[in-house]
Amino acid sequence: MLDFVNLVGSEACMERIETVERFNEIIAQDEPVVAIFKTSWCPDCHFIDPFMPELETNYAGKVTFVEIDSEKLLDVAQQYHILGIPSFVAFKGGKETIRFVNKLRKTRPEIEQFVDRAIAVSAAV
């Protein structure tokens, strides 16, 4: 199965984190990082795939988006108590700043509102 993110142009190409070391390196940045915890089998995770590349492009220079497969990086998912997917967790300087987790399917406006809030919180810390 082809992955939608790999089919889009170079403007939006969310990095998939494959190692704990890379995850720690990315979240240590001084700019906000939004980590999206997903799995390959989660329908709600795939629901967001069509609009995430555009969202990533719209927020370029303000926030970095990364994707984490919660099953492949189980240690990271457990460290941050990721129980539901998709889960959005924002970081700055290696510390969690805010998260967006609930049992419901996430919509584009909700995700945009979360990212705006993550940027604002990041600016305040």
Go through each PLM region and give its residues.
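Non-catalytic, surface beta->alpha helical segment in thiol-disulfide oxidoreductase systems
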Residues: 90-125
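Structural micro-motif
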Residues: 80-92
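N-terminal "domain-start" segment that seeds a small globular fold
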Residues: 2-25
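Short active-site neighborhood of thiol/selenol oxidoreductases, capturing the structured segment around
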Residues: 28-40
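Conserved redox-active cysteine motifs that mediate thiol-disulfide chemistry
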Residues: 37-50
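Short hydrophobic/charged patches on amphipathic alpha-helices used for structural packing
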Residues: 23-24, 74-77
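Thiol-based oxidoreductase modules, predominantly thioredoxin-like and allied folds used
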Residues: 16-18, 37, 52-56, 60-75
